[in-house]
Amino acid sequence: MINRIHHFLSTSGNLLSCSENHYYKWRFGNIKYDKKGKGTPLLFIHDLTAGSSSYEFHQLINNLTDQHEIYTLDLLGYGLSDKPSITYTNNLYEQLITDFIKNIIGKKTSVVATGNSVPFVIMACHNNPEFFDKMIFINPQSLYSQNQIPSKQTKLLKFIFDTPVIGTFIYN
């Protein structure tokens, strides 16, 4: 009952819906994105915190549509994109960004990334420089802190959260 009330209250404003939503059928699920404006392409990548989505940029993008073709997307597992039961890694998001630019935008693109999304944007640019023009980072995290190998404790916690009964109980 509490979850239903919480769901109703959190979705009553319908903040993520938009008449201009598009979906990119990627190999791990449908990726929701919006496209506005004309000019040089500019892709916005949101942070990886709970509750993040392309909605983070809704006030900013209208100021840029005169000179740029703006793309905002909800990363896999966020916003209105699919949320498959897989392990989300920087490599997964690197592939998503590269495939999105290659298959949807189709030309060299400038990217604006925030917070924890910065490392996989850097990796994507390093591995596929032909798809990237400029990179703009907002509040980037330390690359050192993002380059840590999971400890035994972290692996144990992931195992516990992935266990159907225990993980579902903890999340709900």
Task: Annotate each language-model stretch with its function.
Residues 54-56, 81-87, 146-148:
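Conserved catalytic-core motifs of eukaryotic protein kinase domains, centered on the activation segment
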Residues 72-112:
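Active-site loop/oxyanion-hole signature of alpha/beta-hydrolase fold enzymes
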Residues 41, 69, 108-110, 131-134:
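Structural signature of beta-strand start/N-cap positions in the alpha/beta core
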Residues 113-121:
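Gly/Ala-rich beta-loop-alpha elbow adjacent to hydrolase catalytic centers
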Residues 111-114, 138:
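Short beta-strand immediately N-terminal to the catalytic nucleophile in serine-hydrolase-like folds
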Residues 27-29, 34-80:
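Conserved HGGG/HGGXW glycine-rich cap/lid loop of the alpha/beta-hydrolase fold
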Residues 1-23:
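An N-terminal hydrophobic leader/cap segment in hydrolases
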Residues 122-127, 132-165:
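Flexible "cap/lid" loop of the alpha/beta hydrolase fold
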